[in-house]
């Protein structure tokens, strides 16, 4: 009986962890990166290369959908993103922050780089 309980507990906790649920710290960092991508997407095209704007739009779209799948409410996401955009709007493109966000997201979310690249190539963002 004790052995069965331990085995079932291990299976439950392993599968719960394997489902990819994010910690609150990871959710906040992902929201911050999504806000950065959103603000980057509003930088005028003449100021920033089009490929960086398109990457930002696709990343924002992918991450917003991902956060909704993770259980965050769309209104809460939009509210947070608006706060980040208010803070970052009008500031120049920060290559270092954007690169750090890319690395963080690609490491945190399996296949995120591939999915974002698909969005970029599809032209649907």
Model feature map: region roles:
Residues 4-15:
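Sec-dependent N-terminal signal peptides
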Residues 6, 21-22, 89:
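Generic detector of short alpha-helix boundary/capping microenvironments
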Residues 12, 27, 94-95:
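Processing junctions and N-termini across compartments
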Residues 16-20:
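Boundary at the C-terminal end of the N-terminal hydrophobic targeting segment
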Residues 22-72:
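Short N-proximal segments of mature Sec-exported proteins
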Residues 51-125:
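Compact alpha-helical subdomains of small soluble proteins
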């Amino acid at each position: 009986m004790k052995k069965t309980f331990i085995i079932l507990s291990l299976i439950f906790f392993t599968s719960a962890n394997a489902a990819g649920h994010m910690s609150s710290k990871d959710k906040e960092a992902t929201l911050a990166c999504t806000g950065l991508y959103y603000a980057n997407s509003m930088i005028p095209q003449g100021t920033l290369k089009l490929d960086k704007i398109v990457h930002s739009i696709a990343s924002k779209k992918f991450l917003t959908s991902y956060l909704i799948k993770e259980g965050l409410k769309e209104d809460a996401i939009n509210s947070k993103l608006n706060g980040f955009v208010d803070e970052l709007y009008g500031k120049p493109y920060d290559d270092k922050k954007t690169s750090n966000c890319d690395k963080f997201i690609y490491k945190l979310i399996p296949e995120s780089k591939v999915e974002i690249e698909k969005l970029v190539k599809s032209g649907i963002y």
